[in-house]
Amino acid sequence: MFDTLPSEILYHIADFLPPNSVCAVGRVSRRLHAIFTPIVYQSITLRATNEWALNVLDVDSFFLHHDYGRAQDCLRHTRHLCFQAPIQLVRFSRCAYYSIFRMTGMDGCSPDAMSEVVAHKQFLRDLELQVSRIFSCLNPHSLRTFEWKLGTCVPTSIFEADGYLARYQPHIEHLNLLTDGTCFHARHGLGGLSQLRTVKDLKWDGIQHREEVESLRGFLRCNHSHLESLSVGFTPSAFANSLSWNHLVGLGPGDGVCRTPTSMTFPSLTQLSLSQITLPSHFPSDECFTFHTLRSLSLRYCPNQLRLLHLLSKEPDKIQLDSLESCFDFLQDDHRHANAISQFLLSFNGLRNLYLHMSNFPPLGSDFVEGIRAHRATLKWLVYHERQLAPLDDSGLFEEDRDVSPNWVGELDHAIDQRQVTFLALSICPRAARTCLEPAREHSQLQLLHLRFSGPERLHLNLAQEIRALLLEIQRASSVGVCAPGSYFQGDNLDTHDPSRSTHIASLQSSALPHLAEAKAFLSFATWAFSPQGIPSLKALAFGDFSHEDRYEAQRFLIRRRDPSKESQATSEYPDFVPFEVADLDTWEGFLGDGARFLAACPGGGLMESPYDF
């Protein structure tokens, strides 16, 4: 019997089961319930399901399904706690402006009569009351991970100097904060960050005010010696523009030059991610922060980041990265360092993951290709997304950034070894993708291919719906014998002597133009890629924008190769592939591992934004 297996084996089995399966197994017997319940409730996520009502968490629902005694028994096993909300349309000023008044402690005031300050206090009070119900059920000193991903201010009772985390959960090792820096009240309540002195991994996005930077600096002063991963993101504003890396490591603004020996160092840091943070214009290697312990570096739209890469490429003690992500706009940086990324890539070897999102960058020619080629023997993942200013009309008076295909894509096989690269993402159209991938298809080891474009460019389209509609039409044509699903895009297979068949195909083709042309091109490429004449190693194909979770859900589509041993052709519109979703963790864990993280790399903008961006 399954429930007679040793506990060690059952724990090992649970590691390979999805959460729903673990819950189901725990109901089989009392022994399995005792073993699997701690696993089920080890990680808890509470959500605000509606971003227009961010003060309404599903805490009430949790206690509705668990009476207080059972909830306390379940939550005492919790080690990882997360509060989360979607961030799609509401990307700034998320607090009191997007809430449902729960009427707790209103003292007879109508919502319309409430001032902005009172409304904000009531909003945080609503959150505090719900969060405190969860806190009351946790075992003291039990949390190892705390995540506040609501994109709002944090109630003061959580992070203040004498708050809950500092008093009852001081052993947190992983801290993830997503706050609303655009809120005018987001300046207080974080003074207790410095009381958490065992944190190894910090991620904080949405910083804008100087008081927040002071809280972060106090935290870094207490944790810099053992911090292993640091991710910091500012939100653009008149305040944040005057803040820089110097403020974080303990230096004043000065002249932008790091030369003070009293700044903090990070001897254990292996992962660093900086977003929209002004970097020093000069960064001597023997002073301030050292990058030489890093194995992963991510720089997203940081002023002077090209200068930093240029300086690092000249250092005698070369940096040895496994992963590099760089997103930047050439119009906002120094023209003298246009080749900084190429020089940096040529300065070391051994890179495994490279993610680049470049806007308005001049043609780099062979130098850039050689920079990628320097890591040909080790490179496994490559993302390259390029955008350039393009005129909106024939007059050329107005321009905006548009996606473009890389000018070096014709040299793809020279730049990368397709026998090594398993994940590849390019801002390229399906037809061009086939042209550059087909010559090396037989020895290619490509498992995940992502044809990227920027979601905001296609907000007026529902690409996912268009592709599904086209698949349905082709399936209907197949069911009445007009054409086989895979032959729709193969003109030489059409029977032109059958009038009814020709008429139906012509109607499909006319309906696909112009608004379905992109969907048709993608399906044509997918038909080839998963066919015997395509890429044998390919397991999944993505199209569109997968950044920021589900923000661009209508501007993306994902398909995978059909497994003949498990799925009949009747389950698919096509014989060789089936659609699936990013949230299908079973599929990802089955054969693609970190595929979802790869698809979300190099976002075109921030998760949180600012009115200054518009």
Question: What does each of the following model-derived ranges do?
Answer:
Residues 13-16, 68, 134-137, 148-149, ...:
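Leucine-rich solenoid repeat modules
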Residues 2, 6, 333, 404:
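Residue-level marker of regulatory loop/turn positions in helix-turn-helix DNA-binding domains and
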Residues 206, 232-234, 270-271, 275-276, ...:
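Core solenoid repeat modules with strong leucine/isoleucine-rich periodicity
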Residues 163-169, 190-197, 215-226, 241-267, ...:
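A structural signal for leucine-rich repeat
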Residues 1-281, 290-298, 304, 468-509, ...:
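N-terminal adaptor/linker regions at the entrance to substrate-recognition repeat cores
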Residues 78, 143, 172, 199, ...:
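Conserved hydrophobic position(s) of the canonical leucine-rich repeat
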Residues 122-126, 210, 251-253, 335, ...:
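Conserved phosphate-coordination/catalytic loops
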Residues 91, 127, 152-159, 181-186, ...:
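Short, solvent-exposed loop/turn at the beta-strand->alpha-helix junction
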